[in-house]
């Protein structure tokens, strides 16, 4: 089922949000020269929470689908989407390019945020498809 595989992939992909945000939060709290402006703390915390819960959700999607899990996925994607929209807003208010030497500048950060936003929107859309709802015994 291609739609389900896409949901699993995107949910797993969001685990990378914990890696990046964890590093950037560490830089902020250690006052590293590459640390983000303080406006980024809330989006980073949101990313970290979404990221660390992603792999748990992937496991349950594969092993224990249920109507409750469907609701959790919908909520999780909505919270993740809200966090990303906030981060996009912050990216304009307080631009941040952590590692420009490798091309990870303000534009790259904003592009990644927009990509992840589109991915989360696609999952929310797919969660309302009949075959996906049937899979979750909805």
Regions found by a protein language model. Give the residues of each.
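Cytosolic juxtamembrane helix and N-cap/initiation of the first transmembrane helix
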Residues: 1-19, 130-131, 135-138
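Cytosolic juxtamembrane helix at the C-terminal end of the final transmembrane segment
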Residues: 61-68, 124-138
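Loop-to-transmembrane helix junctions at the membrane interface
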Residues: 58-81
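Hydrophobic cores of alpha-helical transmembrane segments in multi-pass inner/ER membrane proteins
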Residues: 49-56, 114-127
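Interfacial non-cytosolic loop connecting adjacent transmembrane helices
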Residues: 28-42, 86-112
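Hydrophobic transmembrane helix segments
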Residues: 13-49
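Hydrophobic alpha-helical segments of membrane proteins, primarily the transmembrane helices
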Residues: 8-11, 37-48, 70, 74-77, ...
